């Protein structure tokens, strides 16, 4: 699976449920800010409950898909569009949709909330560090 980042968005990171049992080593818990939406996001696309998702604050990324038939979902209170075959559609949160090679998703902004989530069926191919996919920006 390959995704081209056109715009990174604000505070866009990969997150899961976080890491536990490492704080005594100085490694913070980290993890998604909204665990409920993280779990819903993974459930809607058929992923494991602790698979990584893309978490974003206020403005999300703009991404170009580089593979056919990818099932996606955006959760939270989010304004987003997706472009399929040069036509732009308004997205609906908590509803899955398929994207194909060269289709784009533009996560414009969150509405009355800080965070939103995006994931794909099958998850992202990432390497775990300290038993988690979560990003801790201050580390």
Predicted features, each with a name:
Residues 1-139:
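Conserved "landmark" site that anchors the functional core of diverse proteins
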